[in-house]
Amino acid sequence: MSLVVFTALVGLLVAPVTVHPMIALTGILFIALGAGASGALNMWSHEDIDRVMKRTRNRPVPSGTVAPGEALGIGLALSGIAVVMLGLATNLFAAGLLAFTIFFYAVVYSMWLKRTTPQNIVIGGAAGAFPPMIGWAVATGGVSVESLFMFALIFMWTPPHFWSLALFMKSDYSDAGVPMLTVTHGRRVTRAHVLVYSLLLAPLAVAGAFTGTGGPLYLATALALNGWLLVGAVRTWRRDEAQAEADRYRVEKAFFRFSLYYLFLHFGAILAEAALKPYGLGGW
């Protein structure tokens, strides 16, 4: 959720318009509320999956802290409040985009894609990529090349991020009956997919330096991060399964952790470029 709020905040702050602080604050508040609503609906629909998986069994619903019906009620109520209040506080386009994001995550991804196809996180990754577009829409009332770039950056980042997790959590997904790529096609194929998507992600991320939100600082950051991304992806791809099991997937876990910092640092660089522009130091 922290990544959702941060990327939405970046999308809002780097838009080329002046936003009243109260509008910005309420916009981020209701986007965060929408993210919380999505999480509640996800826990309701995934109660059977979360109860089996080690990394999710302590969540409120599978642990018994919150009943499934309560999670559903909370999720629906928070969704309605978040969408309506965002529309009243900012604009209808941003509210509509938030409503679509909640629906896509809670219904299309959580209830359908995750349970039916190994491409679940490829298609479903769109849900996590919308927040900066919503933030941008709060500020401008629309979309632009820059907000579409931020969407694309998260969308292309999602598969290697989650597939690297699936490499060392394969048994969890298998036990829960989730058709992750590691379960349906094996780790060798998944490693190749991590490499391919990383090769697609790197030039896209670097190209962002030449959009309206880019600049020399972003370019330097992107070159360094994507160089390291490709090194990690190649190392992950080349790994022998026996070696990976022997060291408990040390390389795969390191790549997964790096991927978290990767996205935060890219968006941090985008935000820094915007902060430097008033002083003539950001952008080209």
UniProtKB/Swiss-Prot annotation:
One Pfam family in the UniProt entry: UbiA
Annotated catalysed reactions: heme b + (2E,6E)-farnesyl diphosphate + H2O = Fe(II)-heme o + diphosphate
Keyword Transferase annotated: yes
Keyword tags: Cell inner membrane, Cell membrane, Heme biosynthesis, Membrane, Transferase, Transmembrane, Transmembrane helix
Main location: membrane
Transmembrane segments: 2-19, 23-45, 69-89, 92-112, 121-141, 148-168, 194-214, 217-237, 263-283
Membrane topology, from the record: Multi-pass membrane protein
Pathway: Porphyrin-containing compound metabolism; heme O biosynthesis; heme O from protoheme: step 1/1
GO biological process entries: heme O biosynthetic process
InterPro entries: Protohaem_IX_farnesylTrfase, UbiA_prenyltransferase, UbiA_prenylTrfase_CS, UbiA_sf
Top-level taxon of origin: Bacteria
Record-stated family: Belongs to the UbiA prenyltransferase family. Protoheme IX farnesyltransferase subfamily.
Protein name: Protoheme IX farnesyltransferase
Protein species of origin: Cereibacter sphaeroides
Lineage of producing organism: Bacteria, Pseudomonadati, Pseudomonadota, Alphaproteobacteria, Rhodobacterales
